[in-house]
Amino acid sequence: MQGNYKALWLNDDLFDECLEVIDQRLLPFIYDTRHLTTTEEVVTAIKNMTVRGAGVIGSVAAFGIYIAAMEVEGDYELLKEKALLIRESRPTAINLMWAVDKMMELLSASANLIEDARSFAIELNDAEALESQKIAEFGCEIIEEILKQKNKTRINILTHCNAGWLAVIDEGTALAPIYEAKRRGIDVHVWVDETRPRNQGASLTAWELSKEGIEHTIIADNMGGLLMQRGEVDMVIVGADRVSANGDVANKIGTYLKALAAHDNGVPFYVAIPASTFDFEIKDGVKEIPIEERSGDEVKFIRGVDEDGVLRRVRITPEDSPTKNYGFDVTPARLISALITNKGVCRANFDEIKEKFRG
């Protein structure tokens, strides 16, 4: 990437070391960071989406265990109570649960809990960065193959929500192949779904792509199908918050509709994920993956800057109209062309996933 961007980092400039994170709620209008120094602050940051994106949530959770270890002064039994609070902060992204469980497993036999918690969190974070790079390489090979098949020099990719470096350390998942394509000199244009109601595409993905100098166009969520009908989308790449053993994919609400449109128009639909996003305990994702329901205010209100450049939050609905706000949907495996993972590309079915990830 052009810049040395990070969604989170350890900050030891203060009296006690803390986790510093970009406050993603304020982007793209204001770049600001938050210092997380307590378990409560970590949980709140995850819940209120100061940080978001499956991978980054997992990384914050891992460092949250380190912060909690300092709070309880190395007492493992007390740490288990803090870990549970972090683990339950959001229900859909499996990376969160995986990171907490992995940290607690690694620390169960530790004689130096605080020091080891710091080391293990850094190791998990670094491992995720390497996985992101592998996804970039495998995904870019698909981009190159599609260009070759279509005898084109320019590719149009549609993505939904945000699955770049703000969401997954270090280059993301869905955006990682796009960043790699740019490094290889490929002419890339990205259709960016706005991704209502929180507008992660319009606010975050567009901001990332702007920083990287990648050509992109923000579109209304309902426009993707028309673009596919007109042949203006060569492929779709999205990330995921949880993938079941049979290949069903939970991702930001609206992903399922894009997959249906892609399937109907013969557009390949790819999901980019690290190993930690798989939930092998769930056999049928459509029926079993828990779906987070968030506040209806996210639908009723929208945030932006006015003509004077002032950041405002305004209501766009009748005051007394009810709302429904599920944060995710599940795309059945049959609609997915392939999964782009850190271990290579595989079809979204039980046998291929098991062979690649469980031996």
Curated annotation (Swiss-Prot):
Coiled coil: none annotated. InterPro entries: IF-2B-related, IF-M1Pi, IF_2B-like_C, Initiation_fac_2B_a/b/d, M1Pi_N, NagB/RpiA_transferase-like. Substrate binds at residues 52-54, 90, 200, 251-252. GO terms for biological process: L-methionine salvage from methylthioadenosine. The record marks 161 as: Transition state stabilizer. Its EC number is 5.3.1.23. The active site is at 241 (proton donor). Pathway: Amino-acid biosynthesis; L-methionine biosynthesis via salvage pathway; L-methionine from S-methyl-5-thio-alpha-D-ribose 1-phosphate: step 1/6. GO terms for molecular function: S-methyl-5-thioribose-1-phosphate isomerase activity. It catalyses: 5-(methylsulfanyl)-alpha-D-ribose 1-phosphate = 5-(methylsulfanyl)-D-ribulose 1-phosphate. It comes from the Bacteria. It is an enzyme of class 5 (isomerase). Keywords: Amino-acid biosynthesis, Isomerase, Methionine biosynthesis. Catalyzes the interconversion of methylthioribose-1-phosphate (MTR-1-P) into methylthioribulose-1-phosphate (MTRu-1-P). PANTHER family: METHYLTHIORIBOSE-1-PHOSPHATE ISOMERASE. NCBIfam families: eIF-2B_rel, PRK05720.1, salvage_mtnA. Belongs to the eIF-2B alpha/beta/delta subunits family. MtnA subfamily. This is Methylthioribose-1-phosphate isomerase. It comes from Sulfurimonas denitrificans (strain ATCC 33889 / DSM 1251) (Thiomicrospira denitrificans (strain ATCC 33889 / DSM 1251)).
